[in-house]
C-alpha cells in the first residue's frame, strides 16, 4: 500500500518513515525515528529527487510506482550519495533504466566507485546550473 503526500501541484513526497532507529548515523538520538525524504515531480518530464535508505526500499518503490501511475521516470536527481539519500539508486535504475541521473561531478564519481550502473547516463551539474522540466525549472546549489 503506497503512502504518499501531495506537497504542491504536481509535486509529491514519496519517501518513507523508519521508526526502528534510535540514533541517526549512530550519533544523534531520535525519539520518533527518521523520515527519508524523496520527492517526485510530475511535469512534462518526471523527476525523482533522491531515493531512500534500503531499509525502507520496498515502501519507497511502491510510492514512486503509485505516483508515476505507468508514466516513465525521466530523471533521477541525486543530491549526495549518503545511504539515506542514495541507497536505492540501483533499484530505481533497475525499475526505470531510461532515467537519466542528474548530480554533481563528485557524486557521479562516487556512484561509479560504488558500482552503480547508469544506463541512460549522467548529467553533471555545477553551482547555479539550471534544468527545465516543463513548467518547473530547478537551480542547483552546492551545500556542504
Where are these regions (language model features)?
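Conserved beta-strand hairpin/beta-sheet module of binuclear metal-dependent hydrolase folds
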Residues: 4-68
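Metallo-beta-lactamase
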Residues: 5-9, 102-144
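Active-site metal-binding motif and surrounding structural segment of the metallo-beta-lactamase
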Residues: 44, 55-102
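Short glycine-/acidic-enriched loop or helix-start segments at secondary-structure transitions
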Residues: 23-24, 60, 88-89, 112-113
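Active-site environment of divalent metal-dependent phosphoester hydrolases
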Residues: 21, 81-86, 108-111
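Short catalytic-loop micro-motif centered on adjacent basic/acidic residues
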Residues: 47-50, 75-78, 139-142
Amino acid at each position: 500500500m503506497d503512502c504518499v503526500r501531495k506537497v504542491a501541484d504536481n509535486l509529491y513526497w514519496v519517501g518513507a518513515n523508519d521508526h526502528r532507529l534510535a540514533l541517526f548515523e549512530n550519533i544523534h538520538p531520535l525519539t520518533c525515528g527518521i523520515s527519508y525524504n524523496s520527492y517526485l515531480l510530475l511535469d512534462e518530464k518526471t523527476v525523482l529527487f533522491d531515493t531512500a535508505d534500503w531499509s525502507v526500499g520496498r515502501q519507497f518503490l511502491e510510492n514512486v510506482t503509485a505516483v508515476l501511475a505507468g508514466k516513465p521516470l525521466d530523471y533521477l536527481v541525486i543530491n549526495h550519495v549518503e545511504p539515506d539519500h542514495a541507497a536505492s539508486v540501483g533499484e530505481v535504475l533497475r525499475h526505470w533504466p531510461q532515467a537519466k541521473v542528474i548530480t554533481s561531478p563528485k557524486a557521479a564519481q562516487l556512484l561509479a566507485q560504488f558500482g552503480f550502473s547508469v544506463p541512460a547516463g549522467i548529467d553533471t551539474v555545477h553551482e547555479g546550473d539550471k534544468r527545465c522540466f516543463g513548467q518547473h525549472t530547478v537551480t542547483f546549489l552546492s551545500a556542504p
